[in-house]
Every structure is written in C-alpha cells, then in structure tokens.
C-alpha cells in the first residue's frame, strides 16, 4: 500500500485468505460471538481491539465469517454503536494531542506539518462519510469544538 503524504513506498502486507464459511476448527457460535462483542464494548474496548481479542482469546479468525455481520453492524443492531466512526475519532484525538503540544511548543515546525496532514485526513474522511450517509450533511470538523465531540 502506498503512503499518502510522502514519496516513499509503503509497507507490504499479507492478504487474508478468501473464505465464505467459518473453519471447522472454530467451535464458537454466532450468539456467543455477539454476546462477547457486546460485553467487550461495555468494558470500553474499541472495535479494532474487539477483533483482536476475539482472535487471540477465543480463536475466532473473523467475526463476519461466524455471525455474518461485522462488529460495527452487531453494535448498531443493539443500539450501542458510536455516532462518529472509530477511525475518524482516532484522527481527531491525534489532532487534539498535536494542538495541545503545539500550544506549548510554538516553534515545532515538524509537528505543525503533522497537524496539517492529520487535519487533511480528517477532512477527507468527513467528506467520504457524508457521501456514504454515515455522518449527517451538516456535520463538520472544527478544531475548537472537537474536544467536546469526542468526550460526548
């Protein structure tokens, strides 16, 4: 995968095998996976970490193979999904940390550039999520109000 804001190449990664049904060695059922996902979400675990916990602790290679639904879909069906997608939330938290750092270290030009690139990614993601109707049309990112959006 190519990198976005550099001339260098990105890291290559392995691709997952194409499967349509769960492997026979996986003995856990769809109802069990759903309850585990909901319990982990109530404990404050993010969706990416839920997938890793399912893989490492419970031997579930892919939640979608067993339940037929993604982790976020399971959360939406049980009305506990977050309003803002997780990748956008993580970028906003990163931008808030950079802004806090730059308020103390005003001459740090490298992190000024990093903040600029991060906020560009945020705007690009917001545009995509508006097109996909995940975010409402009137939603927009403002650095001044971003901290209130995240803590809600």
Curated annotation (Swiss-Prot):
Gene Ontology biological-process annotations: translation
Covalent S-S links between cysteines: none
Region feature (Disordered): 1-23
Segment forming the signal sequence: none
Record's compositionally biased regions (Basic residues): 1-11
InterPro entries: Ribosomal_uS15 (IPR000589), Ribosomal_uS15_arc_euk (IPR023029), Ribosomal_uS15_N (IPR012606), uS15_NS1_RNA-bd_sf (IPR009068)
GO MF entry, a single one: small ribosomal subunit rRNA binding
Pfam families named among the record's database cross-references: Ribosomal_S13_N, Ribosomal_S15
Keyword terms of this UniProt record: Ribonucleoprotein, Ribosomal protein
GO cellular component terms listed in the entry, alphabetical order: cytosolic small ribosomal subunit
Gene3D superfamilies per UniProt: 4.10.860.130, S15/NS1, RNA-binding
Family named by the database record: Belongs to the universal ribosomal protein uS15 family.
SUBUNIT field: Part of the 30S ribosomal subunit.
Protein's name in the database: Small ribosomal subunit protein uS15
